[in-house]
From Swiss-Prot:
This is PanD regulatory factor. The lineage of its organism: Bacteria, Pseudomonadati, Pseudomonadota, Gammaproteobacteria, Enterobacterales. Controls both the activation and catalytic activity of PanD in a coenzyme A (CoA)-dependent fashion. Binding of CoA or a derivative to PanZ leads to interaction with PanD, which promotes the processing and activation of pro-PanD, and subsequent substrate-mediated inhibition of the active form of PanD. Inhibition of PanD activity is probably the primary metabolic role of PanZ, allowing negative feedback regulation of pantothenate biosynthesis by CoA. Interacts with PanD in the presence of CoA. Forms a heterooctameric complex composed of four PanD subunits and four PanZ subunits. Monomer in solution. It comes from Escherichia coli (strain K12). GO terms for biological process: pantothenate biosynthetic process; protein processing; zymogen activation. Residues 1-127 form the N-acetyltransferase domain.
Length: 127
């Protein structure tokens, strides 16, 4: 089975279970999506392994809550997820990712810089 990146527009029961494992701090009812508030996820064997929330506003995009399930980390899933999010939103010329809730800022800085982001006060930017 191939790892695929998807935009979640409707949540299946299994999606809800997997999202609770990825983001235990969010209630399912708080994960609302529309054209400007999106959730992208990495799926493998019908299970979500990682997810990120995306907020779009004109040519600007904000990423938050990027999380890869612990057992899947360090395998390129997060990188593939973000690369596909950026590729699927070509109208966005400037991206921002806040560092709120980041477990290890040093690790995340290296990760974000590998994707072309630069460290800023409070997060990372790619314009």
């Amino acid at each position: 089975m191939k790892l695929t990146i998807i935009r979640l527009e409707k949540f299946s029961d299994q999606d809800r279970i997997d999202l609770q494992k990825i983001w235990p701090e969010y209630s399912p009812s708080s994960l609302q999506v529309d054209d400007n508030h999106r959730i992208y996820a990495a799926r493998f064997n019908e299970r979500l392994l990682a997810a990120v929330r995306v907020t779009l506003s004109g040519t600007e995009g904000a990423l938050d809550s990027l999380r890869v399930r612990e057992v899947t980390r360090r395998r390129g899933v997060g990188q593939y997820l973000l690369e596909e999010v950026l590729r699927n939103n070509p109208g966005v010329s400037c991206w921002w990712m806040a560092d709120a809730g980041v477990e290890d800022r040093g690790v995340m800085t290296a990760f974000m810089q590998a994707l072309g982001f630069t460290a800023q006060q409070g997060g990372w930017e790619k314009c």
